[in-house]
Amino acid sequence: ITEYTPLGSWPTDDILVDETIKSMDATPDQQDLVYTITVQGHGDYPTEKVIENPEITVSGAKDEATNNQWEYYINEIHEVDKFIGKLKDALAQRDEKTILVLWGDHLPTLGLEESDMATGDIFKTKYVTWNNFGLEKQDADLTAYQLLAHITGQMGIHEGTMFTYT
């Protein structure tokens, strides 16, 4: 790993594109479940200015320290967005049927309160799916532990070790 976030505390997520594809290529004659966890958007968000020339600037927070925290977070999430685009493009080139599921397991540690959220709940995050074979979108309000069963059910997968214990 050679690329790290500006604070040096987390590797950047772009390394995961090639690693995910390598994992899928390692089993050419079987279906894969590749569970890739990203970390680039995590961390303590610095109160001092860290990114010298940010692609996205932030203003309007209660003080400069909070602006710096949000600016750091937003720019890291912008980099994550680029990673997701690269991963989606790499998966789109494959002949293997693929579903990409993206979700966040928590909101950033930026002092958010329920009143700050459109849902009124700081413990809810959105999920997004993409596929390369035209599977119709199905919106569902799911908990994290229901998501795997929902996605595999869409694919017609109802057997295997992971279903033995559900």
Where are these regions (language model features)?
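Solvent-exposed soluble domains appended to multi-pass membrane proteins
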Residues: I1-T166
